[in-house]
Curated annotation (Swiss-Prot):
It is an enzyme of class 2 (transferase). One of its GO terms (molecular function) is DNA-directed RNA polymerase activity. PANTHER family: DNA-DIRECTED RNA POLYMERASE, DNA-DIRECTED RNA POLYMERASE SUBUNIT BETA. One of its GO terms (cellular component) is DNA-directed RNA polymerase complex. The lineage of its organism: Bacteria, Bacillati, Mycoplasmatota, Mycoplasmoidales, Mycoplasmoidaceae. Zn(2+) 2 binds at C922, C997, C1004, C1007. Transmembrane segments: none annotated. This is DNA-directed RNA polymerase subunit beta'. Belongs to the RNA polymerase beta' chain family. DNA-dependent RNA polymerase catalyzes the transcription of DNA into RNA using the four ribonucleoside triphosphates as substrates. It comes from the Bacteria. Its cofactor is Mg(2+); Zn(2+).
Length: 1305
């Protein structure tokens, strides 16, 4: 422990002495509480003398009551006078009458259990011995036949199974005959003497009885007899296992196994694998300081009584924790066994009782591992201690990683357009509840801020509470004062990324709904159709400072996943801004335009108003001299602080003047978005230019849409101080709402364009479909080919319809159509909606089991009869039925996808949670070579070179093609430099990457580069692992579930796409045979490609190393990627499809694997229009590929098969070389997301992910020490996390919070 909490945590196997040390007393009675007095029974499971008093400072018998007796122990009832909370931490114990094996060490599927590995007997044999089925040899004695010992030590005698019992019985009979022969020799074969010898007669009798397989007597007698004569000792039960473990010499065993591994001819056979497992286990126990026999317990601990409470229900009934039932059973059986032992009961009865005791203890520790778990009255298995640890409802995930918190509430959200960006409206009722302690403290305050005495509003807490309850008028000024002291934190579930939790300054509102600022809805993914949000209150000074400086909504301008503005206005606001920035010719000219455009342009000058100031122009609009969208002129001098390309008359509209007033004074005037970047110089008529000529050629500019407005906000963020952006956004929001109201945009079914062209297309396609049907019936086409062509035909028809509709809505006729305006501005709707409303619904999907797709068949997941009608026309009955089919599939897909995507996000977070920015520069000289990602099929760009290198550090100095310096090595590549690199024709750039960062834990600032959410160098302490996982997981729900098929002929590649593809890549799942690409294992040239008549596929022959050849057969429907004469490298695709990552690692190395995964992940996301920075994918991949498996330990002390991180391996190898020792060798590994978290080196983090039991068993066996490097481990133990402000001083955090508070407007 230290000032800052726990420094590290070790887990090990508890020794009997340790258990006694924990315990405050032995429990001998199974009773819980007295049914009359409801007090705990002495010596029972709730005994107060062991676990502490039930009531604070009050003993069992009532002799001592009150805190003044604290620390005394009552002479009568032996209860210590203390607080009752000790009942949560004090433990008891049960002394077992017979040793019991710990189920975690005997049953550990799928791998062999620890006891089985230590004793080198099979898992099944351990089980049989422990459960009193079979005997085990403890000592082979001097029992020899043919020069060999009949029994081997640790040999298990199977006398129960008909198959194996013959061999064991024969061995026993052989031993009995040995005894007979020895007695015969002693008595010189005298018949009389032999008949009278009791032992001889007994040996003969036992021998005869053992002939029969159904042994009708206790074998124990035979074994006792054999032991007496030969010294061979047999044992059964946990007692026998314990004795063998006690006698185990770990040092000897270790050397023996090492020798056996060295002598093993095959390093990969099952025998060697088991030897390696044994070596690992023996070394763990040897190095841990634990003794193997501690795996078999002679006493068990009893958990504190408050952790397994007994609760009284109505009607005098009780309910209790399942744990109590287990303990009760153990105590009853244990006490019964003690009595039997005291009365010298027969061995067979004792063994039976010991087995029952073993089973009772097993069910306490792990009820579900048993074949027949102990069930309750309702026939459900009772929850054992293992169940309390694992799963979502277990201790780790339910109680340690996520807790319910006080000072919180939740309510429905409604929009609050009047709020500032950092404000939230909290209902008065909620404020009274949440801020109650602060309000009361203010009401009873006797001194003011300066320390002067004042008259309190309420004399005491009780009166203050009454005033709050009555909602007295006197409390409201106090409430207003109190809520200014601290912000509140808002959270909307599901919290898919860090912007799902933000802080706001509270503002009291009427009603019961929380009022939310409209601009933050995108970040929360909230809408106002009944969504609820939770409110939390930061209590400590540090928490308040953190909320104000880091969590406040107005600081979150850019989304962390792509660095794009996340507070872009939406819907009504967009509509208002679109209307406000729209340009029109003056009304008279507009009317003329329809009749005579040339004359209208000449007349334009007579209706062109020029103003000298902004106010004058706005006044003219208010007086209705001009309309808000009319093109007008205004002198450039009317705009102070703004720079123009020249002086003169700026051609703009009143709407644009009003819009520009929302921006800071020195911000460029936005007449068109291009103005921001100096393109298309401002529309200014210069001092000596002809106004008439200018106006004649004038074309109306496009208004601002959602997309262009986002560009404006992005630019504003780049050039302004952080506090200016939210102020400007609030002004834009207000303008948006105001002018969407003034625009009076309405919506009606008759606004939808009418369209009839489609029926001609339908006629053509129907004819084609019937032709295809005839071809199929004539046997010219297979059903698969017919289906594919039909679907393709209808898809093309819909494409034509879509194209027509697009042309229609972009035509002049519909430019003022309200629905078209909504779609064009980006407020609501898109072309696909118009196609369905005015054109046709098209083909619908149907349910299809993608997992069972056959090898060569076509995926028939589309109903081949399209829906020809549009929604405006209305659907026919059959069309409605088909469309409901697709709609339902869509709903179920979404539900499935959400769950799967959530699980993937959890796995991503668990894999990367320990990755934090640790230092400024790790000094690595390695990087990754980055090229543009292109889709090789249609040669389109998926991600440009600029997108991939911007915000990263260069490894080498970069020159353009003319040898002119662009950027030096180890310098940041800004957006401008990235543009120059891309335009100079450079195809690839080597940059720093998290994949090659040499920091021992985490990543350095330079290897990561710019923080996408601030556009500044990433700060130390940023938990980029979690941010990367969120950025990849959050859009996961937007990925499609279906497998795209490229349409066209059967045999075109059916490649898994969308979410399933991401899962395949990150979980390292082998692609199915029919979509797996054939890759080259060698570097060479394609010699020839031959058709294989047997398989209908191809044989691709590659020549390598001058005159070596290798042949790659392909499946029948494979699409080739190579042609004769092509140069080919190892790992390159020969056929289309998905590459198996493990094959790629084998033939092309880890770097190619990393590049492949980045490229494929980007392909999936970008094809869905989701932009994610490469850096995040690299952080994830670095965690999947940063482990290495030892193949030869050299002199390092590591062992074969051990998995360690690359950085650790490098350190060990360097030390070996420096000390002139033999370094270890190893191979790279790729782990999927399912296995990566358990390889993190922290058992707490791994156990809270999956396989809790196995991870804790392994960690305890090796006495593992958790150094608490990651975030989860620290959360579990209640430490501050080693990231963000957790690494800073408290004073520093508070000072920063106060500084940022001053920046609020």
């Amino acid at each position: 422990m230290s000032q800052k909490g726990i420094k590290s945590l070790t887990i090990s196997i508890a020794s009997p002495e340790q258990i006694l040390n924990w315990s405050k007393g032995e429990i001998t009675k199974p009773e819980t509480i007295n049914y009359k007095s409801l007090k705990p029974e002495p010596n029972g499971l709730f005994d107060e003398s062991i676990f502490g008093p039930s009531k604070d400072y009050e003993c069992y018998c009532g002799k001592y009551r009150k805190v003044k007796h604290k620390g005394k122990i009552c002479e009568r009832c032996h209860v210590e006078i203390t607080e009752s909370i000790v009942r949560r931490e004090r433990m008891g114990h049960i002394e077992l009458a017979a040793p019991v094996a710990h189920i975690w060490f005997t049953k550990e599927l799928p791998s062999p259990s620890k006891i089985s590995l230590l004793l080198d007997i099979t898992y099944k044999e351990v089980d049989q011995v422990v459960y009193f089925v079979n005997y085990i040899v403890l000592d082979e004695g001097n029992n020899v036949y043919d020069g060999k010992s009949i029994f081997n030590k640790k040999e298990v005698l199977d006398l129960t199974s008909p198959k194996n019992s013959i061999r064991s019985r024969n061995k026993l009979r052989r031993t009995l005959r040995n005894i007979q022969e020895r007695i015969e020799d002693e008595l010189n074969h005298e018949r009389e003497a032999l008949i009278q010898d009791f032992d001889y007669r007994l040996a003969v009798t036992y021998d005869q009885m053992l002939k029969d397989s159904n042994i009708p007597f206790s074998v124990k007698d035979v074994m006792a007899f054999i032991e007496k004569h030969t010294g061979v000792r047999f044992g059964i039960g946990a007692e026998a296992i314990r004795e063998l473990l006690e006698k185990l010499n770990l040092e000897e065993e270790h050397e023996k196994i090492k020798q056996a591994i060295q002598n093993s001819p095959n390093a990969y056979d099952q025998k060697t694998k088991r030897l390696l497992r044994r070596l690992e286990c023996v070394r763990w126990i040897k190095d841990s300081g634990s003794k193997p026999e501690w795996m078999v317990m002679t006493r068990i601990p009893v958990t504190p009584s408050e952790t397994r409470p007994i609760i009284s229900l109505d009607g005098g009934r009780f309910t209790t924790s399942d744990t109590n039932n287990f303990y009760r059973k153990i105590i009853i059986r244990n006490e019964r066994l003690k009595q039997m032992q005291a009365t010298d009961a027969p061995e067979i009865l004792l063994d039976n009782e010991k087995r029952l005791l073993q089973e009772a203890v097993d069910s306490l520790f792990d009820n579900n591992s048993r074949k027949k778990p102990v069930v309750g009255k309702d026939k459900r298995p009772l929850k054992s201690l293992s169940n309390h640890l694992k799963g979502k409802q277990g201790l780790f995930r339910q109680n340690l990683l996520g807790k319910r918190v006080d000072y919180s509430g939740r309510s429905v959200i409604v929009v609050g357009p009047e709020l500032k960006m950092y404000e939230v409206g909290i209902p008065a009722l909620m404020i009274l509840k949440l801020f109650r302690p602060y309000i009361i403290s203010e009401l009873i305050r006797k001194r003011d801020e300066l320390g002067n005495e004042i008259q309190p509003i309420c004399a005491n807490i009780k009166l203050a509470e009454q005033k709050i309850l009555a909602q007295d008028n006197e409390i409201w000024p106090v409430v207003e004062k109190v809520i200014k002291q601290r912000p509140v934190i808002l959270n909307r579930a599901p919290t898919l990324h860090r912007l799902g939790i933000q802080a706001f300054e509270p503002k009291m509102v009427d009603g019961k709904a929380i009022r939310l600022h409209p601009l933050v809805t995108t970040a929360f993914n909230a809408d106002f159709d009944g969504d609820q949000m939770a409110v939390h209150i930061p209590l400590s000074k540090e928490a308040v400072a953190e909320a104000r400086s880091i969590l406040l909504a107005s600081w979150h301008i850019l989304g962390p996943k792509d660095g794009k503005p996340i507070i872009t206005p939406t819907q009504d606001m967009i509509l208002g801004i679109y209307y406000l920035t729209k340009e029109k010719f003056p009304q008279v000219i507009e009317e003329m335009m329809a009749k005579d455009p040339t004359q209208a342009r000449v007349e334009f000058i007579n209706n062109f108003h020029i103003f000298s100031t902004q106010d004058e122009a706005i006044r003219a609009y208010k007086l209705k001299t001009i309309r808000i969208n009319d093109v007008i002129g205004i002198t450039t001098k009317a705009f102070n602080n703004k720079t123009f390309s020249k002086e003169g008359i700026l051609v703009t509209t009143v709407g644009k003047i009003i819009f520009n007033q929302a921006f800071p004074v020195n911000f460029p005037y936005i007449n068109d978005v291009k103005n921001l970047y100096g393109e298309n110089q401002f529309e200014i008529i210069g001092m000596h230019e002809s106004i008439l000529d200018y106006l004649k050629a004038y074309n109306l500019k496009e208004p601002l849409t959602k997309k262009t407005l986002s560009t404006v906000i992005d630019y504003l963020y780049k050039v302004s101080e952080i506090e200016v952006v939210p102020q400007t956004m609030d002004k834009i929001k207000a303008l948006g709402f105001k002018y969407s109201m003034i625009s009076a945009t309405s919506i009606s079914a008759f606004d939808i364009p009418s369209y009839d062209q489609k029926y001609e297309y339908f006629k053509e396609t129907d004819e084609l479909v019937s032709k295809l049907r005839e071809f199929y019936l004539d046997g010219k086409l297979t059903d698969d080919e017919r289906y594919t062509k039909v679907v393709q035909a209808w898809s093309q028809t819909k494409d034509k319809v879509t194209h027509d509709i697009e042309k229609l809505i972009n035509s002049n006729e519909y430019k003022d159509n309200p629905i078209v305006i909504m779609a064009k501005s980006g407020a609501r709707g898109n072309t696909s909606n118009f196609t369905q409303l005015a054109g046709m619904r098209g083909l619908m999907s149907k349910s299809y089991n993608y997992d069972q797709k056959n090898n060569n068949g076509v995926i028939k997941d589309t109903i081949e009869i399209p829906i020809k009608h549009s929604f405006i026309e209305g659907l026919s009955v059959s069309e409605y039925f088909n469309s409901s089919f697709g709609a339902r599939k869509g709903m179920t897909d979404t539900a499935m996808k959400t769950a799967k995507s959530g699980y993937m996000t959890r796995k991503l977070v668990d894999s990367t949670q320990a990755v934090v920015i640790k230092d400024h520069d790790c000094g690595t000289k390695e990087g990754i070579i980055v090229r543009e990602i292109r889709n090789t099929k249609d040669n389109t760009s998926i991600e440009s070179l600029k997108d991939r290198i911007v915000g990263r550090y260069s490894i080498n100095t970069i020159y353009d093609t003319k040898n002119k310096l662009i950027i030096e090595s180890d310098k940041l590549i800004t957006s401008e430099i990235a543009n120059i690199i891309q335009n100079s024709g450079i195809r690839e750039v080597e940059v720093r990457s998290p994949l090659h960062c040499a920091s021992l834990y985490g990543v350095c600032q330079k290897c990561f580069g710019l923080d996408l959410s601030t556009n500044k160098l990433i700060e130390t302490g940023t938990a980029i692992g979690v941010i990367a996982a969120q950025s990849i997981g959050e859009p996961g729900t937007q990925l499609t579930m279906r497998t795209f098929h490229t349409g066209g002929v059967a045999g075109d590649t059916n490649i898994t796409q969308g979410f399933e593809r991401i899962k395949q890549l990150f979980d390292c799942i082998q692609p199915q045979e029919n979509e797996k690409a054939v890759i080259s294992q060698v570097k060479g040239t394609v010699e020839r490609i031959e058709k294989d008549s047997n398989t209908n596929g191809y044989n691709v022959v590659i020549k390598y190393n001058k005159d070596n050849y290798v042949n790659y057969p392909t499946r029948s429907n494979a699409v080739l990627r190579v042609k004769t004469g092509d140069e080919i490298i190892a790992g390159q695709k020969i056929t289309e499809g998905s590459i198996d990552v493990n094959d790629l690692l084998k033939y092309a190395g880890i770097e190619n694997v990393r590049h492949y995964i980045i490229k494929e992940v980007q392909k999936v996301y970008r094809m869905q229009g989701i932009e994610i920075s490469d850096k995040y994918i690299e952080v994830i991949i670095s965690q999947l590929t940063n482990k290495i498996t030892i193949t030869n330990p050299g002199d390092s002390g590591l062992f074969v098969g051990e998995t360690i991180s690359i950085n650790e391996f490098t350190e060990v190898a360097q030390n070996m070389l420096v000390n002139k020792k033999k370094p270890p060798s190893a191979i790279n590994q790729v782990f999927g997301l399912d296995h990566a978290p358990s390889k993190s080196g922290s058992f707490l983090s791994a156990a809270s992910f999956q396989d809790t039991k196995k991870i804790l068993t392994d960690a305890a066996a090796r006495s593992q020490k958790d150094m608490l490097i990651g975030l989860k481990e620290n959360v579990i133990l209640g430490n501050l996390i080693p990231a963000g402000t957790g690494l800073k001083d408290v004073e520093e955090v508070i000072a920063y919070g106060e500084e940022m508070y001053k920046k609020q407007y």
